[in-house]
Amino acid sequence: EPTAAASQVAVFRRNPYHLHGRQLFFSSSIGTEALMAEVILDQVEEARALAAKVADALDYVGVMGVELFVTPAGLLVNEIAPRVHNSGHWTQNGCAVDQFEQHIRAVVGLPLGDGARHSDVVMENLIGDDIDKVPAILKERHAALHLYGKAEARPGRKMGHVNRVVRKG
């Protein structure tokens, strides 16, 4: 659910929690509240303000990913992705309006849609030979498969992702 942060910048209230490892990137809204409880509320607000400041400084319109590191000296911007981002792919199956539609709405001047999360989602990238998991994924009842149409699997190449959905309430 977006909230105004600075001029025309909207920042999502619920940030997904990300885990990196073994060339896999997971983005999950499951357990977000418990995981975020470990992060000081001031840091969350500082992160939102910093992301809004970056977007304002760039006069940016659209979806943007801003990756931050928590350091002893405070938050540090590590990466700016001025586009829809892998960390938001969970929104395809977890929100009323996903990051792709939000981006289009923003760049053509339409109001942002309802970004409220209706389901918990765990997103898993399919990297390289992970594409071989597709037959098993297709047997999963609550898995939504998103393939990128790449002809050849190579080590480290993103071939697609799967969103595993758990309906709320």
Predicted segments, located by residue:
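Internal nucleotide-binding/catalytic subdomain
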Residues: 1-63, 70
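Generic structural "secondary-structure junction" signal
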Residues: 26-28, 32, 37-42, 86, ...
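Active-site "cap" helix and flanking loop/linker of ATP-utilizing ligase/carboxylase catalytic domains
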Residues: 45-66, 71-72, 81-129
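Short, surface-exposed linear patches
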Residues: 18, 42-43, 91, 98-102, ...
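Peripheral (often C-terminal) accessory segments that flank ATP-dependent C-N-forming ligase machineries
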Residues: 3, 9-14, 105-169
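Surface-exposed beta-strand edges and their flanking turn/coil or helix-capping segments
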Residues: 10, 32-36, 45-49, 90-95, ...
